[in-house]
Amino acid sequence: MSPLSIVLLGFAMSTDAFAAAIGKGAAMRRPRWRDAVRAGLVFGCIEAITPVIGWMLGRAASDYLAAFDHWIAFGLLGALGAHMIVAGLRNESEVDEALRDTPKRYGLLALAATGFATSIDAMAVGVSLAFLDVHIGVVAAVVGLCTLSMVTAGVMLGRALGALIGKRAEILGGVILILIGSTILYEHLSGAA
C-alpha cells in the first residue's frame, strides 16, 4: 500500500468522525481549542485502535463483524443523537440544572461512545488490511493523526455554526449523528441486498 493510499485511507476513515465533531462543536456553548483538541485526541485514539483490533481479528471474524457492525453504529449514533435532540428541546433552566448534575466523566464517556460509533466500520477495514502488505502500526498512526486533525477542525467549525444558529445547534448535532448512523445502516443493508 503506497504512502498516498494510506493517507487517503486515513482521511476517508475519519469523515464520519469529522461530521460528528461538527455536530458536537455546534452543540457546545463555547468550545475552546482545548475542547476541540481533547475531542480530536479521543476520536483519533479510538479511530487508530479500531483498525488494529480488526486487523488482529483477521479473516475469521470478518463475516461475524459484517453481520452486525452497522447495527451497533446505528444504535449508538441514534441513541446519542436522540439524546442531543431532547437536550436541545429543553428550556435553559432545565439544561443548566442537567449540566450542574452531570459528572465531568460523562462528557468523556459520551465523547468516547460517539468516537467508537463513528469508527466501528474501521474495524472491518482493519480486517481487510490483514490480507494486504501493510504495516498496521503506520496505518493506525496515520488514521489517528488524520482523525485528530479533522475532529479538531470539525469542533471549531461547528462552533462557528453554533454561534449562527444558537440553541438549535444541539438539535442539529443530534440530527447529524442520527443521519450518520442511518447512512451507515443504509450502506450496509443496500450492499447486502
UniProtKB/Swiss-Prot annotation:
One of its GO terms (cellular component) is plasma membrane. One of its GO terms (biological process) is manganese ion export across plasma membrane. It is a multi-pass membrane protein. The chain crosses the membrane at residues 3-23, 37-57, 66-86, 109-131, 146-166, 171-191. Its main location: membrane. It is found in: Cell inner membrane. The keyword Membrane applies. Pfam families: Mntp. One of its GO terms (molecular function) is manganese ion transmembrane transporter activity. Keywords: Cell inner membrane, Cell membrane, Ion transport, Manganese, Membrane, Transmembrane, Transmembrane helix, Transport. InterPro entries: Mntp/YtaF (IPR003810), Put_MntP (IPR022929). The keyword Lipid metabolism does not apply. Probably functions as a manganese efflux pump. Belongs to the MntP (TC 9.B.29) family. This is Putative manganese efflux pump MntP.
